[in-house]
Amino acid sequence: MTSVLIIGGGGMIGQKLASSYAKSETVSLLDMAFPENSDLNVKKILGSVSDASIMEKTLSELPGTIFYLASIVSGEAETNFSKGWDINVHAFWSFLAQIRDQYLKSEGQYKPKIIFTSSIAVFGSPFPNKISDDFLTAPRTSYGAQKVCCELMLNDFIRKGFCEGLAIRLPTICVRPGKPNLAASSFFSGIIREPLNGLKANLPVSTDVRHWHASPRSAVGFLRHAESLDRNAMTFNGALNMPGLSCTVEEQIEALRSIAGNEAVKLIEAKPDEK
């Protein structure tokens, strides 16, 4: 039986991913905080990915599969430049270095499978109608640049034989439950979630903006499928684009109208924001 470690397991996707495993599986979650109402039968480790001692202790248990979900989200990575690079890149490098240390200590016997959640933010415009896995990565944000760096680092550690795994580029997850986060794409969920709860929602872009979405359930499915893949049987650059639903903001709004009516749509307020 392979043990599973979910780094960033306190978040929405991490919690859903953990719940997808049978109770007989050994699952550990590491994060800064966890939902109070969670009844998951898992080991919870409080700590930051930037804390080398906590990471060393956690990895000393030699988990067979590691999902690396932890990150500073796009909006915060842009406004807090140093924090974005420290958490999204430097901490990931430290994590990989510790994986290599465990590999060397075991004389090559320990080679975990690492599934890293990257993002469509690695791409920059202009876009083709269909974006392939090997489309040029030319990010226009710090967050996107940080994700590209992590993809390349992971790919090199895999090439050197220190671990197995791959990076998967998730579309924007929509609709996210709960409160808005600091992601630049948070409004895509907000313009649906808030009106359905009788609350106003800000729309910072024009309604002809087209974006790429996937549901939380789909995201968990992508992660579990990635866990089952044999990297040796694949010929690719180490990162795969995940499928999603492409739609405009206007199409989102019309879908809301068809479900909740005009009164819900009236709660969406256009407030252009070039950021």
Q: Residue spans of the language-model regions?
A:
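Rossmann-fold cofactor-recognition segment
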Residues: 40-51
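NAD(P)H-binding glycine-rich loop region in Rossmannoid oxidoreductase-like domains
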Residues: 49-87
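Conserved Rossmann-fold NAD(P)-dependent oxidoreductase catalytic core, especially the SDR/UDP-sugar
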Residues: 93-140
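NAD(P)-dependent short-chain dehydrogenase/reductase
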Residues: 155-210, 216, 220-221
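Glycine-rich NAD(P)-binding loop of the Rossmann-fold in SDR/ketoreductase-type enzymes
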Residues: 50, 79, 83-94, 137, ...
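Active-site Tyr-X1-5-Lys
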Residues: 125, 140-166
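C-terminal substrate-binding subdomain of Rossmann-fold SDR/epimerase-dehydratase oxidoreductases
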Residues: 204-206, 212-275
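N-terminal Rossmann NAD(P)H-binding glycine-rich loop of SDR-like oxidoreductase domains
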Residues: 4-23
